[in-house]
Design a protein with these regions (language model features):
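Short, Lys/Arg-enriched N-terminal segment that forms or immediately precedes the first helix
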Residues: 6-20
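Short capping segments at the starts of secondary-structure elements
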Residues: 23-25, 37-42
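Pre-recognition alpha-helix immediately N-terminal to the DNA-recognition helix
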Residues: 28-33
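A short acidic, leucine-rich amphipathic alpha-helix
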Residues: 45-49
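Basic amphipathic alpha-helical segments that dock to polyanions
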Residues: 58-68
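Non-DNA-binding regulatory cores of transcription-related proteins
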Residues: 68-148
Length: 148
């Protein structure tokens, strides 16, 4: 296990403990799977990696972790919700979403691009009398596999 993974597990355990919840083996396995997957993952993708996990317990743990803002859903372009750790644990990033198969990959832009995006959002928000609390950029297109 990488040092970063240890740090994430420690932070997750702490957040759950502060809310009176336990970092059970099932929750830890789920966080491990999401860390290993490295991008938003659907329940079928997660179950394929750990077939011994029951689907019902996975959904229950996903709901608990989502309620605690440890993970969140990322909507793709198919019938499967995908889950990933929140930015508190894996850092700020954006998504490339395939409109054909629904796969989602993470990407990071440079600090100067983030500043330009923040500036553009602030300008649009002022015009609309809107308060921006954060942003995420989802780029839609075709993944390499679907372009073939």
């Amino acid at each position: 296990m990488k040092a970063h993974d240890d740090s994430v597990h420690h932070q997750v355990a702490q957040r759950l403990h502060e809310s009176g919840l336990k970092y059970t083996a099932g929750r830890r396995q789920l966080v491990d799977l999401l860390l290993q997957h490295g991008r938003p993952a659907s329940v079928p993708e997660l179950l394929k990696k750990r077939p011994r996990l029951t689907q019902s317990s996975m959904y229950r743990n996903l709901a608990d972790l989502e309620q605690m803002e440890i993970i969140h859903k990322v909507s793709g372009n198919d019938d499967h919700a995908r889950y990933e750790l929140t930015e508190d644990f894996i850092g700020h990033h954006h998504h490339l979403i395939c409109v054909r198969c629904g796969d989602i990959d993470d990407f990071v832009v440079t600090a100067s691009t983030e500043r330009a995006l923040d500036k553009a959002l602030a300008h649009a928000a002022r015009a609309a009398k809107f308060t921006v609390s954060g942003h995420q950029l989802d780029a839609l297109g075709l993944c390499a596999r679907c372009k073939r």
